[in-house]
């Protein structure tokens, strides 16, 4: 096992512990708590994959951080902070929408890279809006926290979330997963739109119809789906 992989995990465990203390002392806001919960799932998955105990890793991570801080000068710390771009947290969904439990009559789940896509195949002929909470850096989507698909009535019928065991994903991973979710929902004649906020930071533009600009790969995948459906309809006739 690579030593840098282990030390990175140990430091992440300790930093999560520090952030948890901030929450316990009621010094955090909703986005901070949201990221803490997401990172907890990620650390559990990484610990299982690496075969490392989180409590022991946290202790070692503390020693690593203390050593770095002891050697770090105040001036170097100021320069590092000044040169690091700050990310912003974007919220399409309210806390209630983000934390609400939902159920599927005909569940379907698909893993696309480091992201998990879930949708209810029982939903038909509905107008659906995709909304997401995510972080942004340099005006581009950085990290997806959670994406959900809502009907006009407010019911949740689909979701995209990061896999805890596969930390880290790119903007292309997110766009590909959105394309898969849209294709799955449109299979049952649903009309799917993407929030303007998500369009802006994921694609850098917005579509008046609410549809994101799809990649050639996504377009081919959706075209194959449409052709298969037409063939089935002809056979049924």
From Swiss-Prot:
Enumerate the InterPro entries for this protein. NS1 (IPR004208), NS1A (IPR000256), NS1A_effect_dom-like_sf (IPR038064), uS15_NS1_RNA-bd_sf (IPR009068)
Q: PABPN1-binding: where is this region? A: 223-230
Disordered, as annotated region: 205-237
Span list, region RNA-binding and homodimerization = 1-73
Q: Name one GO biological process term.
A: symbiont-mediated suppression of host type I interferon-mediated signaling pathway
Question: Which ranges are annotated Basic residues under compositional bias?
Answer: 217-237
- Location(s), subcellular: Host nucleus; Host cytoplasm
GO cellular component terms given for this protein: host cell cytoplasm; host cell nucleus
Q: Where is this motif: Nuclear localization signal?
A: 34-38
For this chain, the Swiss-Prot or TrEMBL PTM comment says: Upon interferon induction, ISGylated via host HERC5; this results in the impairment of NS1 interaction with RNA targets due to its inability to form homodimers and to interact with host EIF2AK2/PKR.
Q: Gene3D superfamilies this protein is in?
A: Influenza virus non-structural protein, effector domain, S15/NS1, RNA-binding
Positions of short motif Nuclear export signal: 137-146
Q: Which GO terms describe its molecular function?
A: protein serine/threonine kinase inhibitor activity; RNA binding
- Tell me one Pfam family matched here: Flu_NS1
Q: Which superkingdom, per the lineage?
A: Viruses
Annotated stretches, region: CPSF4-binding: 180-215
List UniProt keywords, sorted A-Z: Eukaryotic host gene expression shutoff by virus, Host cytoplasm, Host gene expression shutoff by virus, Host mRNA suppression by virus, Host nucleus, Host-virus interaction, Inhibition of host innate immune response by virus, Inhibition of host interferon signaling pathway by virus, Inhibition of host PKR by virus, Inhibition of host pre-mRNA processing by virus, Inhibition of host RIG-I by virus, Inhibition of host RLR pathway by virus, Interferon antiviral system evasion, RNA-binding, Ubl conjugation, Viral immunoevasion
Q: How does it assemble?
A: Homodimer. Interacts with host TRIM25 (via coiled coil); this interaction specifically inhibits TRIM25 multimerization and TRIM25-mediated RIGI CARD ubiquitination. Interacts with human EIF2AK2/PKR, CPSF4, IVNS1ABP and PABPN1.
**The record's note on its domains:** The dsRNA-binding region is required for suppression of RNA silencing.
What exactly does this protein do? Inhibits post-transcriptional processing of cellular pre-mRNA, by binding and inhibiting two cellular proteins that are required for the 3'-end processing of cellular pre-mRNAs: the 30 kDa cleavage and polyadenylation specificity factor/CPSF4 and the poly(A)-binding protein 2/PABPN1. In turn, unprocessed 3' end pre-mRNAs accumulate in the host nucleus and are no longer exported to the cytoplasm. Cellular protein synthesis is thereby shut off very early after virus infection.
Similarity field: Belongs to the influenza A viruses NS1 family.
Protein name in the entry? Non-structural protein 1
User: What are the top taxonomic ranks of the organism?
Assistant: Viruses, Riboviria, Orthornavirae, Negarnaviricota, Polyploviricotina
- From the UniProt record, report the name of the gene that encodes this protein: NS
């Amino acid at each position: 096992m690579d030593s840098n992989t282990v030390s990175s995990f140990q430091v992440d465990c300790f930093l999560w512990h520090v952030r948890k203390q901030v929450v316990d002392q009621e010094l955090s806001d909703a986005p901070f708590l949201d990221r803490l919960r997401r990172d907890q799932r990620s650390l559990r998955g990484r610990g299982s994959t690496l075969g490392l105990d989180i409590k022991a890793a946290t202790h070692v991570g503390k020693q690593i951080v203390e050593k770095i801080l002891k050697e770090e000068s105040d001036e170097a710390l100021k320069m590092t902070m000044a040169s690091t771009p700050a990310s912003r947290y974007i919220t399409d969904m309210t806390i209630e929408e983000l934390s609400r439990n939902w159920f599927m009559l005909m569940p379907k789940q698909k893993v696309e890279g480091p992201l998990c896509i879930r949708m209810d195949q029982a939903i038909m002929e509905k107008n659906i809006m995709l909304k997401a909470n995510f972080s942004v850096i340099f005006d581009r989507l950085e990290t997806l926290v959670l994406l959900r698909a809502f009907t006009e009535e407010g019911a949740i019928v689909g979701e995209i979330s990061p896999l805890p065991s596969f930390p880290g994903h790119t903007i292309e991973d997110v766009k590909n997963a959105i394309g898969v979710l849209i294709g799955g929902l449109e299979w049952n004649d649903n009309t799917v739109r993407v929030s303007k906020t998500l369009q802006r930071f994921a694609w850098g533009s917005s579509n008046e119809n609410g549809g994101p600009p799809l990649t050639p790969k996504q377009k081919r995948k959706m075209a194959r789906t449409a052709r298969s459906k037409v063939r089935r309809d002809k056979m049924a006739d």
